[in-house]
Amino acid sequence: MTTKVILYFPSDATDKAVTYDLVKRYDLRINILRAEIEAGRSGSLLVELTGEEPMVREGVAYLERNGVTV
């Protein structure tokens, strides 16, 4: 499954390595299509997530639990 999502990071979530965790924990491939983010400030990423459908859903839930709006 491949899906495009916009991730909105509040300022307190910009220092977390959540995209790395998506790769390691959920076996997802991430293609960053657009990024507007600065350390210590809010920002957004347009990404394409590719992986097994249950893992994509779990990965999105993980992001939301860590303060990222999907």
Give a label for each model feature:
Residues M1-V70:
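Long, contiguous binding/interaction regions
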